[in-house]
Amino acid sequence: MVYQQFINYPHLNVFENVAFPLKQRKVDDQVIADEVTKSLKSVGLEGYENRKIQELSGGQQQRVSLARSLVKNAKILLLDEPLVNLDYKLREQLREEFKNIFSQGLSEDSIVVFSTTDPREAMEINGEVIVLDEGKVLQVGPAKEIFENPKTLKVAEISNDPPMNILKASIETNKIKFEEIEVELPNHLSNLKEKNFNLGIRASDIKLSDSGFEFEVELAEISGSETLLHLKRGNSRIIISIEEVLNFNIHDKVKISFNISKIYAFNENGVLSSSPFGGSYV
């Protein structure tokens, strides 16, 4: 098991930390040396065997913890939010490396249970995803299926960062209407049974546009290399993501357009009625 807090033995060096569970089992010294070398190589710490734990960065310490778990050749590996205490850059780096580590450092019949509150981690690491909310299973399936066809409004909110925008909308004469805005009814919603529905659209599917609809800026949030704009119009609140760092002031007026081919429809009970990818749970 790998915890969110780095748990290593401070009085032991890297090799001794990783070898510890095998020493406890009284495994042959040569086997220990081979297995530790293999595990350290899989987590990118080959050559660090004699380093003291205190000499390592946070990311390196977490890799030592992971190597110690891998060296056991356990059938089930549980990682409890292993990246949460790392800085942004390290999280990005290790998230990419974990996929390679799992494929190289584990046997084919091993199972990895990766717990996270970050939907990006779940989607990027991939595999089978279980969406939980207050202990209740909301949806189970491949990461791609969860992303493309979230079963309910709650799943759509949980499995996206920022959460999927949800707006109260209605269909009238082949138009979608909300907050005095009208957009064309996309083909994938043409057979929608209900007139009134919850419209879902991701932040990345809304763009700034000189010919778009006017909204007011409530907050401009810089996140890495992108800007998240929190906007309002009437009683509706939405977030859009811009793939560059831009400056906005509160109460600025901006115009935006919606990619109607990426609109989701959830019925009044919050269940997916139609998605751009053909999914429906009604």
What are these regions (language model features)?
Residues 4, 11-151:
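ABC ATPase nucleotide-binding domains
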Residues 148-172, 259:
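C-terminal boundary and immediately downstream tail of ABC-type ATPase nucleotide-binding domains
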